[in-house]
Design a protein with these regions (language model features):
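A well-ordered secondary-structure block
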Residues: 14-100, 130-167
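A short alpha-helix/helix-coil micro-patch that ends at or immediately precedes a cysteine
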Residues: 1-8, 124
Length: 187
């Protein structure tokens, strides 16, 4: 909401090209998210004024009258919700972020890391057995990390926790790659 209000846009993609999943990865330093969705709504002030009661009703209507937004609000698989509200002279912006939080790191991940730095943690995954960490790079390229940031890796990455679950039949397994926090790897 703050990004939209002060950077003059309204939508799910910010001017720098980021979507809600990138914002979740930037701000929550422990979350491992299986699914996420975002709702945005806005009410503009008319001639510099707005009616608070009317604005709340209009924002609520904007969200509940949209089939996609309503589906996000009523989704039974959502485990956590975050909401941001910003009021300025020009209007009110509301952002709702919905996640299926499937796991968490045991400690917050640093914002900046360096090659060789250890990843001495085993995340708790709901329903999955942790296998290893990975790094999602630009262009959806993935690199296995093991227990440390490898030499040669640099720039912005998104940590992933890779898990495995036994299937219904012997020898059948499911795998998952859960997006985690964003990290800048420096040299």
């Amino acid at each position: 909401s703050l990004d939209m209000a002060y950077n003059g846009f309204f939508g799910h993609q910010s001017p720098d090209g980021r979507h809600h999943d990138a914002r979740v990865a930037a701000f929550d330093r422990r979350a491992l998210v299986k699914y996420s969705a975002e709702n945005v709504a806005m009410v503009e002030a008319v001639r510099g004024r707005w009616n608070q009661r009317d604005a709340v009703a209009r924002l609520h209507g904007n969200l509940m009258d949209s089939p996609g937004h309503r589906a996000n609000i009523l989704n039974p698989d959502i485990t956590d919700v975050a909401m941001g509200v910003v009021r300025t002279k020009s209007g009110v912006w509301v952002t709702q972020v919905f996640v299926d939080l499937t796991g968490a790191l045991t400690a917050p991940l640093p914002v900046r890391m360096r090659p060789g730095q250890r990843l001495d943690m085993t995340p708790a995954l709901r329903g999955w057995h942790f296998q290893n960490f990975g790094a999602k790079q630009a262009g959806n390229r993935y690199v296995a990390l093991g227990r440390a940031i490898p030499a040669g890796l640099h720039g912005d990455i998104e940590l992933t926790a890779n898990g495995r679950m036994r299937g219904e039949q012997p020898g059948l397994y499911y795998t998952i790659r859960l997006p985690g926090p964003a990290v800048t790897v420096g040299r």
